Regions:
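Domain-level cores of phosphate- or acyl-group-handling catalytic modules
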Residues: 177-256
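Short, conserved catalytic/metal-binding motifs centered on acidic residues
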Residues: 57, 99-113, 142, 218-224, ...
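A short, flexible helix-boundary coil/loop motif
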Residues: 1-37, 45-46, 53, 59, ...
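Active-site-proximal, Lys/Arg-enriched surface segment
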Residues: 43, 73-174, 284, 289
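Short helix/loop capping segments that flank catalytic or ligand/cofactor-binding pockets
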Residues: 112-114, 152-153, 228, 251-253, ...
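Electropositive, glycine- and tryptophan-enriched low-complexity nucleic-acid-binding patches
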Residues: 68-73, 127-213, 298-314, 318
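Electropositive nucleic-acid engagement tracts
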Residues: 22-37, 45-122, 205, 209, ...
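Short amphipathic alpha-helical "interface-anchor" segments enriched in bulky aromatics
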Residues: 109, 324-355
Length: 466
């Protein structure tokens, strides 16, 4: 854990720019001096400590910033939280002259304690790793990919309707008992938005805020491969919509229905080379413009498998004017949203967020973590690479460098203080307090080893056994 006495220099510039941009949207009202100081230090603290924890922020600042005041600002200060994300996006787009790109949609789970009660939108989800269940927050992300940078644009918390969940469980139980549908309770109306509606809402919000931005394509995984999602995006903007469909979905060839898997078994694939994750990869692919039953109109359906794979995956596109190779190339960009999510979990503090209760607590914590992502594009080393049309540095390597910079600045302040020895002893005590030694159950100090032996009276009783 590195010390942090002052707000990082590039963060100060970034937060000041946020305030200036806010004045353009907020009738001349930007952030107050106190809000600028608070936001700058908190963003710096998240980068240095990789957590959103007010007690840790107090320790690494040598108690310059008290945890009670930090959390008080977080909970009660009237910051324009939603507008902060908007103006931050405007800053990044303007800084690098970004006018077009591809939108990616994906969701991720943030696991929580099974005893959680007051965290917003925490619910039971299936654990993909174990096959069991856990309690988690599910977050839908909208991410923009451009020819220079990849940035998060927005998020939404998904929460299933509790009444509908109860009805579904009861309905399944009655089905097993072979109770007729007419005698089972009717399905209640859902009062919560589903994931598709949340995804469409995120795209709609971005388009309304940036109407001049050219969206080349919207890409999402097979969960969004359906008519409702496609129609929702089409109602917002005219763009290519790329997704996947399941192998058992029905398509029509010469008016006859059959599964998409059975259809493409009839045709040998064509070898192609595509660029995926920055590397050339050999693939087998074959595309057809055919009518999909679930969509009710023609789609460009492409069967694709990578070298070494046995089964095809089936990619769909709504704009039939694109070439198959271009559709596949756009679809491979989906891995970038996964990279963003891994960076966000590993370096943006939210994955180690101290419990913040309620909707506001979760939303504000997540906004802070995404502002950290945006702020990194204003670090002088990162911006120099992007301006030179070179690949930007990884989030991990950049944050490691920033931590060293913060450490050197702190050492410099200690050396030039009025009483360097006293200042050193104080900060060392605070930093060592972050890593307190905890008792390990692995080392069983009070274990009585003498109990692990046979007893004389039992040995005599069972002498002739075995």
């Amino acid at each position: 854990m590195f010390p942090l006495f002052n707000t990082l220099y590039f963060i100060s510039i970034y937060v000041q720019s946020l305030s200036e941009q806010l004045k353009l949207l907020n009738e001349g009202r930007g952030l107050s001096k106190t809000q600028i100081c608070w936001l700058g230090f908190v963003l710096s603290g998240i980068i240095v400590s990789n957590t959103i924890c007010w007690a840790i922020f107090e320790r690494i600042s040598n108690k310059k910033h008290k945890s009670a005041k930090l959390i008080g600002m977080f909970r009660r200060a009237k910051l324009p939280w939603d507008k902060l994300m908007l103006v931050s996006i405007k800053l990044v787009l303007a800084r690098y002259g970004l006018t077009e790109g591809v939108l990616l949609l994906d969701d991720s789970d943030k696991n929580r304690s099974k005893n959680v009660r007051k965290i917003h939108a925490a619910h039971k989800v299936k654990d993909k790793a174990t096959g069991g269940y856990s309690i988690a927050q599910n977050i839908m992300f909208l991410v923009l990919v451009t020819d220079k940078v990849t940035i998060p644009l927005g998020f939404a918390f998904y929460e299933p309707d509790p009444e509908w969940v109860k009805w579904r469980a009861k309905d399944k139980q009655l089905k097993k008992q072979k109770v007729p549908k007419s005698e089972r309770p009717k399905e209640p109306k859902k009062n919560h938005k589903n994931k598709r509606e949340l995804a469409v809402g995120l795209v709609k919000e971005f388009v309304s805020n940036f109407p001049a931005f050219k969206i080349r394509s919207v890409c999402a995984d097979c969960f969004f491969g359906n008519k409702k999602f496609a129609d929702g995006i089409k109602a917002i903007c005219k763009t290519q919509i790329i997704s996947q469909i399941r192998s058992n979905q029905i398509v029509y060839i010469r008016g006859k229905p059959l599964s998409v898997n059975d259809l493409f078994k009839r045709y040998p694939g064509i070898p192609e080379t595509i660029n995926c994750r920055g590397e050339d990869k050999n693939v087998i692919m074959y595309g057809m413009r055919i009518k999909g039953k679930a969509y009710g109109h023609k789609l460009f359906v492409i069967a694709l498998k990578y070298e070494g794979e046995e089964d095809y995956r089936f990619i769909t596109a709504t704009d039939l004017s694109w070439r198959a190779i271009d559709i596949v190339s756009a679809y491979t960009l989906r891995w970038l949203v996964e990279v963003f999510i891994q960076d966000w979990k590993g370096h943006m503090g939210f994955d180690r967020l101290a419990i913040q209760q309620g909707d506001d607590g979760s939303r504000r914590g997540l906004i802070l973590s995404l502002l950290v992502d945006h702020s990194l594009f204003f670090h002088e080393d990162q911006s120099a690479l992007i301006d030179a049309k070179l690949q930007a540095g990884t989030v991990g390597s950049l944050t490691n460098r920033i931590k060293v910079e913060a450490f050197l600045d702190s050492v410099k302040e200690l050396i030039y203080s009025d009483n360097p020895k006293e200042a050193y002893e104080k900060i060392s005590k605070d930093l060592m307090g972050i890593y307190e030694l905890r008792s390990s159950k692995k080392h069983m100090v009070n274990l009585d080893m003498s109990q692990y032996e046979g007893k004389p009276h039992l040995a005599a009783q069972f002498r002739n056994v075995a």
